[in-house]
Amino acid sequence: MKIIILHGLYMHGLAMQPLSHKLRSFGYQTKVITYNTLAIEKNRVFEKIDQALSPDTTNVLVGHSLGGLIIKAYLDKRKPSQQMVSHVITIGTPIKGASIVHRIQELGIDAILGNSPEHGLKMHHDKWEFTQKLGCIAGTLPVGARALLMMDRSILSDGTVTVEETMIEGMTDHIQTPSSHTSLIYNSFVPKQIDHFIQLGCFDCS
């Protein structure tokens, strides 16, 4: 089984190598895809995913933050079979858009986001209707810019994305962990949960 991994905003594929390494230790093939998150060329990213998918085994798509939204757009465009792509796991992904992005736009500093809001980060209503099983992982350690920009410390978040924003109607399972938005991809909890979700179709809540 092969896992294709996409990073989030302001990141490079190198940031996902520790997660990739941990997943390889579980016996998976992995491929990390790098793309320009501020000047997203959707078709080029989709072509990279096409090339990364193995025709000889089942594939899994894993995305951190914006990467999960790129995966959702990929499924909508390419509509791969469940035999080709069986599972999707999002890590800290605002699957229906991010309120912090709306706030940044209100403040008139949205140039820092490049064209990323046009690729899923704007708030939108949606539900998961793809054949692939979707597992969503959320952080609950509010370390990040959200507290300064949003002034909503009472809302459970990872410091960037709220827990509620990581949920979508139709998802298969959802789990929380005390991590910040960035540290989600560096702990040992996430790769173990990815493996559990792939193998059993649910997260390990024990």
Regions found by a protein language model. Give the residues of each.
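C-terminal catalytic-base region of ester-bond hydrolases, centering on the histidine
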Residues: 130-206
